[in-house]
Amino acid sequence: MGCMSSKYADTSGGEVIQKKLSDTQTSNSSTTGSQNARVPVLENWLNIVLRGKPQNVESSGVRVKGNSTSGGNDIKVLLLGAGDSGKTTIMKQMRLLYSPGFSQVVRKQYRVMIFENIISSLCLLLEAMDNSNVSLLPENEKYRAVILRKHTSQPNEPFSPEIYEAVHALTLDTKLRTVQSCGTNLSLLDNFYYYQDHIDRIFDPQYIPSDQDILHCRIKTTGISEETFLLNRHHYRFFDVGGQRSERRKWIHCFENVTALLFLVSLAGYDQCLVEDNSGNQMQEALLLWDSICNSSWFSESAMILFLNKLDLFKRKVHISPIQKHFPDYQEVGSTPTFVQTQCPLADNAVRSGMYYFYLKFESLNRIASRSCYCHFTTATDTSLLQRVMVSVQDTIMSNNLQSLMF
């Protein structure tokens, strides 16, 4: 197996650390029989596409949204990954960092979507409580019907006091929170943890979403969207494509002439089911996709960059949801390499050990010895961290381009 060159942004001081790891042993990527039984089968069409590199790709009329530039020297960056890995959040961060950001009109539109995220999560939790024969606290039962009722919201209209009262009460309900903390088989939106802590502010009649509110907002990506940014006198064209299985047939229309591929993985997905398939595991799906993509000839000249994302959520859940329950070959190590410790200087060994374990899982899948893949631990909602990481990503892309010209 080929080695994987990893580049990390130090979250404490911004220093970039580069480390070259030797070939990993086969045991790093092995799984038990019971674990393999849960691995989803990659769609045949995607396997065929990734194994070959046809001369002509037939167009299916996929519409690319955004401001496209036609310059031959543009840097094309493709964001790939399974659903709910954080690709669209990266795009929103790029808008905040390298463009004017979000207008008041757009912020008011996000207000409606944030409301829908909260209500959808509560409906899912109420359904899970019913399936588990768990009741709300007696004083909160009256709010069940309020949440399950069909709701509509407009960008300029305040939320009703009735809905606020119900949401406020249920987000504090201890029995609902217990189901929430144990609901690894739920396709619960990660952002619900964040919005729970801001209910009073969100339901204020004058509420306008903040940058963080927008970054946490979950919107399913359908089709292909494009944003162009001017960075250091270079035009970067970022393509975000839907990660759920139903969207992957559209990926091929972005595969040609890719300068850099950013593959996103939700670290917090090690114990979560897929949004589109309750029997599938998010991390297993990501490993399967990465295996096919990083070894594909489509990207033989592209910089390969891996974002192990949602580190903040991973740190929160690793103590309440054991990794070994979902990945039986996992063993906590006594110490981790310096580059892992640098990423999480305040984290305990359980968190660092988990980070290193999943890093090695992805590292071991790169079977092309000549290909360097660069890895970053990220929290896509952390703007300052993403800014440092993106500086490193730009360096990686430019270095890869220079090597291509030389060889």
From Swiss-Prot:
Region G2 motif: start and end of each range? Answer: 213-221
Q: Which cofactor does it need?
A: Mg(2+)
**Region of interest (G3 motif), ranges:** 236-245
Q: List the GO biological process terms.
A: G protein-coupled receptor signaling pathway; negative regulation of MAPK cascade; negative regulation of pheromone response MAPK cascade; positive regulation of conjugation with cellular fusion; response to pheromone; sporulation resulting in formation of a cellular spore
Q: Where is this chain lipid-modified, annotation N-myristoyl glycine?
A: 2
Give the start-end ranges of region G5 motif.
378-383
> What InterPro entries would the database entry show?
Fungi_Gprotein_alpha, Gprotein_alpha_su, GproteinA_insert, P-loop_NTPase
For the ligand (GTP), the binding residues are: 84-89, 190, 215, 221, 243, 309-310, 312, 380
Lipid attachment locations (S-palmitoyl cysteine) = 3
Q: Which Gene3D superfamilies match?
A: GI Alpha 1, domain 2-like, P-loop containing nucleotide triphosphate hydrolases
Q: Has the keyword Hydrolase been applied to this entry?
A: yes
The ranges of region (G1 motif) come to: 76-89
Give one Pfam family, short name only: G-alpha
> Which intervals of the chain are annotated as region G4 motif?
305-312
Annotated GO MF terms: G protein-coupled receptor binding; G-protein beta/gamma-subunit complex binding; GTP binding; GTPase activity; metal ion binding
Keyword tags: GTP-binding, Hydrolase, Lipoprotein, Magnesium, Metal-binding, Myristate, Nucleotide-binding, Palmitate, Pheromone response, Sporulation, Transducer
Record's function text: Implicated in the mating and sporulation pathway. Probably coupled to mating-factor receptors. May act in concert with Ras1.
Question: Subunit arrangement?
Answer: G proteins are composed of 3 units; alpha, beta and gamma. The alpha chain contains the guanine nucleotide binding site.
Return the PANTHER family for the record: GTP-BINDING PROTEIN ALPHA SUBUNIT (PTHR10218), GUANINE NUCLEOTIDE-BINDING PROTEIN ALPHA-1 SUBUNIT (PTHR10218:SF242)
Q: Which family does it belong to?
A: Belongs to the G-alpha family. G(q) subfamily.
This protein's name: Guanine nucleotide-binding protein alpha-1 subunit
